[in-house]
Amino acid sequence: MADGEDIQPLVCDNGTGMVKAGFAGDDAPRAVFPSIVGRPRHTGVMVGMGQKDAYVGDEAQSKRGILTLKYPIEHGIVNNWDDMEKIWHHTFYNELRVAPEEHPILLTEAPLNPKANREKMTQIMFETFNAPAMYVAIQAVLSLYASGRTTGIVLDSGDGVTHTVPIYEGYALPHAILRLDLAGRDLTDCLMKILTERGYSFTTTAEREIVRDIKEKLAYIALDYEQELETAKSSSSVEKSYELPDGQVITIGAERFRCPEVLFQPSLIGMEAPGIHETTYNSIMKCDVDIRKDLYGNIVLSGGTTMFPGIADRMSKEITALAPSSMKIKVVAPPERKYSVWIGGSILASLSTFQQMWISKGEYDESGPSIVHRKCF
């Protein structure tokens, strides 16, 4: 390897549902695997099978039938540090096959992440993994970078949490950031419930993954929900079939758009919250009147839960209805938006101007974990 190459920074975007990890400068993450740690439900009886006390990611996924699955990140925020450490260990050693002590590491965090969380992340990187340098960046800001903008409002919706983050000339405006605890996992739960009402039983953590797959493959967002419901009642044009792992085939119709409609109408699952369109609008309205025009014209979608077909048109329609009538509204849905946080991180970590931003091991040893608040905005 060339001299310059072995110090390629690592970029690790830890989401509630998936970990996206790889090398700065690459155009896509090398490793994408579920943020799951699984522990055996039964004690092993076969000797020499090399059973482990914990499985991470895809391996946990494939053995899900015999494991209890745990998600160390909930609503975008880490709540189980031991498991999180296992995930990071797996990321560096098994997925990327690198020695973390040789690479600067860029991590991502949810907007409005508690301060203590940020410090704990920093501490683990330096003390457990001996990183030479690290940095923590806000996810939505990275998505905006990836779209080639410095001003706009990002609607970032993943598996565990949705945020609207207005950014002006590269600065996130914290007073106007809004968080909505409604995201992909809730939609999966909602679909599980709808399917259960129809007589299919999906209950275990393993079966939830099947429902997630159905959602990702078949769900879409209706431009006009009521109209679509009428269509679904009167014709079979929206029906699609899906084959379960055991060969059973199920047909889903109106569920295809009933499930993601929750993003616009959280009341459908009994949540007292504004929909994503209203949250975006409220977020814009919390900003200075002079910059609103720039935000309305740069609404950037990011995260896996914005991958539903039809979301950009519907978003555009709903925001047009809320905004002043002469306002030009543009909703941008980049095709790679599932990974745009990671891509933004890859761009940021490879900028020459960013190199002085890293927190070095030396600075950490001198100041302790609180250094992260001074160096990372």
Curated annotation (Swiss-Prot):
Reply yes or no: does the keyword NADP apply. Answer: no
List, alphabetically, the InterPro entries matched: Actin, Actin/actin-like_CS, Actin_CS, ATPase_NBD
Do you know which PROSITE patterns this protein is assigned to? ACTINS_1 (PS00406), ACTINS_2 (PS00432), ACTINS_ACT_LIKE (PS01132)
Q: Could you tell me the EC number(s) of this protein?
A: 3.6.4.-
Q: What does this protein do?
A: Actins are highly conserved proteins that are involved in various types of cell motility and are ubiquitously expressed in all eukaryotic cells.
Q: Which PANTHER family match?
A: ACTIN
Q: State the name under which the record lists this protein.
A: Actin-3
Q: Lineage in the entry?
A: Eukaryota, Viridiplantae, Streptophyta, Embryophyta, Tracheophyta
